[in-house]
């Protein structure tokens, strides 16, 4: 079954909003910060093993006085002001997240980088058909280089999901509720089905975007 694009009127409140660059930047920074593990750790002079004994007597050697071989300026000593495990996540209001997603989608829509298909029509998983569908939509460059695509699928479209997931990191498959500012900006083109577009519009129209 051939994949057919459809003409739809995209809601202006979501796809024709003013692009707010500072807001997008703030939300993307918060999203990337939340993705950090924050497990970095170094030992201070009190945590490094050893160093309890004074290396040499206080006076009479002609050398600078030293109290421990684990001081930061000693080889094998602790680290002064080094990193410790921490949580980098930032609380971002839901309204800001929603507004940033809308700004990013409006930017893509303004550059004609959003495509809507009627339905994918995969009854069995087929990577070959997935590649053919992308080529039929004109989403491969002349040199056959794969553009970065975001394909928005429904949970029930399992065969379609299995077909596209083999195409590598340049094809990002997301659910409507997983659409986020960073992924929208990372991808060159976004492909909705009529069903997932309706779900996305319902989600963003009601302002229920999740916190980052």
What residues fall within each predicted segment?
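Glycine/serine-rich anion-binding loops at beta->alpha junctions
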Residues: 45-81
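A short, flexible low-complexity segment enriched in Lys/Arg and Gly/Pro that occurs
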Residues: 22-59
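Extended polybasic, low-complexity segments that bind anionic RNA or targeting/receptor surfaces
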Residues: 1-37, 83-212
């Amino acid at each position: 079954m051939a994949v057919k694009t459809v003409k739809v009127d995209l809601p202006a409140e979501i796809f024709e909003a003013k692009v707010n660059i500072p807001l997008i930047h703030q939300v993307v920074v918060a999203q990337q910060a939340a993705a950090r593990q924050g497990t970095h750790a170094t030992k201070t002079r009190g945590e490094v093993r050893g160093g309890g004994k004074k290396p040499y007597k206080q006076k009479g050697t002609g050398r600078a006085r030293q109290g421990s071989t684990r001081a930061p300026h000693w080889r094998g000593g602790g680290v002064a002001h080094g990193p410790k495990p921490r949580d980098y996540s930032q609380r971002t209001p839901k309204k800001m997240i929603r507004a940033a997603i809308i700004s990013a989608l409006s930017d893509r829509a303004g550059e004609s980088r959003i495509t809507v298909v009627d339905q994918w029509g995969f009854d069995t998983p087929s990577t070959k058909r997935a590649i053919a569908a992308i080529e039929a939509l004109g989403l491969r460059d002349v040199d056959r280089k794969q553009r970065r695509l975001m394909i928005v699928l429904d949970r029930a479209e399992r065969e379609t999901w299995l077909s596209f997931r083999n195409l590598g990191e340049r094809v990002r498959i997301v659910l409507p509720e997983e659409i986020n500012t960073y992924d929208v900006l990372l991808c060159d083109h976004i492909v909705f089905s009529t069903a997932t577009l309706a779900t996305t519009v319902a989600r963003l129209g009601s302002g229920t975007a999740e916190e980052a």
